[in-house]
């Protein structure tokens, strides 16, 4: 199965290809290069996500250690949700 080695972003890219670019996905499957393509694109997406996360954390500083635990967890979830939205836009370049 193709999804065994793919992470979250690779799976998202695969679903996007299947749904919005079926001809390209079929060609990659027939060539036998779909897994290599998705792994390479996932590598790109992970780098992009790390860059976006770094920039978001600069723009929205981490709550201080004195803040309660719930605030710190909410901050982490907020950053991750924002990163995921940026990555979903980037997947359209697949």
Can you annotate each of these PLM segments?
Residues 1-94:
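Extended, charged helical/alpha-beta scaffold domains that provide interaction surfaces
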């Amino acid at each position: 199965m193709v999804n065994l080695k793919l992470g979250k972003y690779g799976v998202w890219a695969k679903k996007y290809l299947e749904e919005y670019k079926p001809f390209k996905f079929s060609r990659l499957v027939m060539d036998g290069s779909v897994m290599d393509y998705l792994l390479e694109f996932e590598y790109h997406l992970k780098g992009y996500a790390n860059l976006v996360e770094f920039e978001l954390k600069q723009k929205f500083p981490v709550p201080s250690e004195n803040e309660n635990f719930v605030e710190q967890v909410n901050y982490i979830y907020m950053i991750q949700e924002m990163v995921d939205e940026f990555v979903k836009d980037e997947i359209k370049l697949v």
